[in-house]
């Protein structure tokens, strides 16, 4: 590991602090809680949508979330290690065959749906038995 990678690792460790970043991929529906500053107040705003891309690497990694708000498509790019991103929650896992889902921009309504990834039987049996 060279010096730059080592510095990146140290910075990622300090920026994550106590929060955990879940394992997610394009196609997953995410709920991102973002810190919003309004005047002197600071509050959390939830942004829920489909992850359509992940880009970059290391400390520069970011992801794009797309949602439909009042009939208009809205995309927002979040840096993964930003202090403004409070938490990321995976709402559901999607089954896709592409790393970049930019084709969703041209689809409307039911055509833009992503099928949910099915869990394997051993995992569902464990949760059912508990």
Swiss-Prot record:
Keywords assigned: Ribonucleoprotein, Ribosomal protein
InterPro entries: Ribosomal_bL19, Ribosomal_bL19_CS, Ribosomal_bL19_sf, Translation_prot_SH3-like_sf
A GO molecular-function descriptor: structural constituent of ribosome
PROSITE patterns from the UniProt entry: RIBOSOMAL_L19 (PS01015)
Gene Ontology biological process terms, A to Z: translation
A Pfam family: Ribosomal_L19
Origin superkingdom: Bacteria
GO cellular component: cytosolic large ribosomal subunit
Function field: This protein is located at the 30S-50S ribosomal subunit interface and may play a role in the structure and function of the aminoacyl-tRNA binding site.
Family: Belongs to the bacterial ribosomal protein bL19 family.
PANTHER family tied to this protein: LARGE RIBOSOMAL SUBUNIT PROTEIN BL19M, RIBOSOMAL PROTEIN L19
Protein name per UniProt: Large ribosomal subunit protein bL19
């Amino acid at each position: 590991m060279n010096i730059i990678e080592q510095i990146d690792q140290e910075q990622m460790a300090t920026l994550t602090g106590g929060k955990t970043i879940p394992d997610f991929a394009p196609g997953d529906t995410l709920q991102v809680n973002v810190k919003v500053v309004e005047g002197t107040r600071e509050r959390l705003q939830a942004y829920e949508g489909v992850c359509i891309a992940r880009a970059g690497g290391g400390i520069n990694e970011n992801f794009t979330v797309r949602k439909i708000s009042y009939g208009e498509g809205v995309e927002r790019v979040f840096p993964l290690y930003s202090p403004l991103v409070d938490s990321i929650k995976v709402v559901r896992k999607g089954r896709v065959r592409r790393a970049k889902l930019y084709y969703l921009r041209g689809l409307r309504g039911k055509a833009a749906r992503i099928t949910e990834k099915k869990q394997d039987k051993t995992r569902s049996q464990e949760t059912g038995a508990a």
